[in-house]
């Protein structure tokens, strides 16, 4: 199952948090979800030319304002000179949302082990006619040197302008997809080349996290199972004693 499911969704609520951190039970919740998608698409498209290296965008909502946390490899490209770029971006997003927008830019310390940035970098190289094998191998080497415990990259499409589409992948280290406590970063990116689109999938294993929390959850679950078994055993004993009394009568 771990080989098929999205690694990020598989770990949500355990070791990974949601990208939209707000709650609403009103009928307009679908409009807010759609608005989050529009915000992310707009921010990525606007900062693509600057090559800011956007790893992820976290959106938080309150009744009065919308807070957007942008994780970027080059935060200076997002902020701009004297903060002009970020001020213009917040004003444009305020017109989209109809609320006050607050933007915080967080620097990504190790962009070499961020799956989204690795995929974007490979896509950029493929669109500029760099060999896909060279781009994949260089990305894996840089990630392993930067502290990743395992990397896997797969490219699929008309690789090298071939007539027949195929997929190739390179892997180094280990990628434990079935282990929920394993911090596996995943990204899927599309490169638009002259020959057609090429799909890029990236898995980066960064080690295990929150072992104590998972052990506590497992202990609680074991206690519940034991309590259920004890309750079931007590009910069975009561039913057997009642049957014996009936037979004696």
Curated annotation (Swiss-Prot):
The answer, when asked if Repressor is one of the entry's keywords, is no
One Gene Ontology MF term: structural constituent of ribosome
Kindly give the CDD domains that the UniProt entry links to this protein. KH-II_30S_S3 (cd02412)
Q: Which UniProt keywords apply?
A: Ribonucleoprotein, Ribosomal protein, RNA-binding, rRNA-binding
TM annotation in the entry: none
Give a single Pfam family match.
Answer: Ribosomal_S3_C
Q: Which residues form the KH type-2 domain?
A: 39-109
- Homology family: Belongs to the universal ribosomal protein uS3 family.
GO BP, one example?
translation
This chain belongs to the protein called Small ribosomal subunit protein uS3
One GO CC term on file? cytosolic small ribosomal subunit
List all Basic residues biased stretches.
240-249
Q: How does it assemble?
A: Part of the 30S ribosomal subunit. Forms a tight complex with proteins S10 and S14.
Q: Which InterPro entries match?
A: KH_dom (IPR004087), KH_dom-like_a/b (IPR015946), KH_dom_type_2 (IPR004044), KH_sf_prok-type (IPR009019), Ribosomal_S3_C_sf (IPR036419), Ribosomal_uS3_bac-typ (IPR005704), Ribosomal_uS3_C (IPR001351), Ribosomal_uS3_CS (IPR018280)
Q: Does the keyword rRNA-binding apply?
A: yes
Compositionally skewed regions (Basic and acidic residues) per UniProt: 226-239
Functionally, this protein is described as follows: Binds the lower part of the 30S subunit head. Binds mRNA in the 70S ribosome, positioning it for translation.
Region Disordered: what ranges? 226-249
Which positions are tagged coiled coil?
none
